[in-house]
Amino acid sequence: MSKNLSELSGRKGLTNNLFEKIGEAAKENGTPTTEALEKLANEFIIGKANTYGTASFYDFTKEENKDKKIYLCNGTACVCAGKQDDVKNKLEKHFNINEIGHMTCLGRCYENAAFHYNGKNYSGNDISHFQISNPKPQIPNYNIKSTTELLTAPFGGIEKHYSLLKTALKKSSDELLNEIKKSNIRGRGGAGFPMAFKWEACKNEKNDTKFIICNADEGDPGAYSDLYLLENRPHSVLFGMMIAGFITGAEWGVLYIRAEYPEAVGIVQKAIDELRTNNLLGNNIDGSGFNFDFKIIKAQGAYICGEETALINSIEGQRPEVRTRPPFPTKQGLFNKPTVVNNVETLAAVYSIIKKGGDAYAKLGTEKSKGTKLVCLDSFFNNPGIYEVEMGTPLSKVVNELGGGFKSPVKAMQIGGPLGGIVPIEKIKELSIDFESFAQNGFLLGHASIVCIPTNFSMMKYLEHLFEFAAYESCGKCFPCRLGTKRGHELTSKANNQNYKIDRNLFNDLLDTLQQGSLCAHGGGIPLPIKNALQYFNDELKNYFN
């Protein structure tokens, strides 16, 4: 059924897609009317249940949020900072309680106190002078430093930047793919999958229509590196997508940008317009015979769309449920066509690889983790911000030298988002910023976002927060995740609020079921931080179990 829906959705192509039409139908009243959804179902020759199922999933289109006027961030960094209750109290002076909703991570983890109003994000001291009639968000201000400058290198202007593209287009796709292979770059979105393998698989598919998708739905609380690249280095991302298109034979690049990053949408669109003005988009670019264009899809608020197949379903206007694999997207992706899905930071790294060569890139980092990595530090650090470091850099250097240590006592850090490991402070000296170091020690590097858990923050409260997040954001397709995350939240909530003792054997069975039975890394990944907490903070947690 899903395959048929993909075909039906693809009949009108990217420029007239169902997902955007559902979003447009929600603008006036906060949610699409029944009549609008039925009309779209008829237009795209799909069932009415399909359009309703899609609209009822997203934060910005679902019925229960239609009266929301302002959204408070409930991401992990903001929760740990302990400022959101004060922000909510101040917002209640301007809005009724039923007009205040929540969103998970606005990318303001470096100063917290974040909220979203009327298409803009606010944080820090913004709440102190917030006025509905004339809101003025301050310009984001955080540290951006590099020990090895690649991703954070200054932008040299359109002409200089894209002279490299013109040179690259004179080479064969095999030559360029070989440079990607030699670089040994692995995906920066969390999984660490070899990028060249994905590109080659798509290249080898025989199909006249292919797509490159930039997964800019960075939803991991604590991570704002993709936001930085989209707002400050958009042409690095666009360049990477164009090279991917040339190598694989794709003519469309789709940027799926999360709704929680509204400013980024406008900045990336401006960058695309600059390319068009300079005749670097469309047919036969620079006389090379290469055709390529971009389409921005603005997401509507769903963390699960960071999973590549849920993202593809979302673009098609389907409910963003995870697909079973195989077939993989490189064979059957968007509209059932061969598709490459890469993370923002992964695509941005392509510029350096093409400019300096794959061998030069591979000299950076460790044996299996090459290149550089952006690391995000939250507001508990004396120097919060984004730091570009070479893979293999000691975590202690990131924390103590670059980050300047902690402002207040911290007992652990969650690194790599809500599905990343919980690293106790005493383990910092044993880790380095690379995939293998974290995996060998029972953690996950993921996006390399670092959220601090203060000493006075209950670890059981933290586990409740993780389960609440996982349950709310589950796509609901597989039973282990849909039911297991909900059950985990119920157990931890009761333990925190009702003097309830959790059966440890039952809890362990729940974690094993989630890990082994879930269809994707959402349900399968949430047991990792829970198990880390049980291992390293047993003394604090043991009284909650029998």
Give, region by region, the residue ranges found by the protein language model.
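Feature of Fe-S/electron-transfer and energy-metabolism proteins
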Residues: 1-546
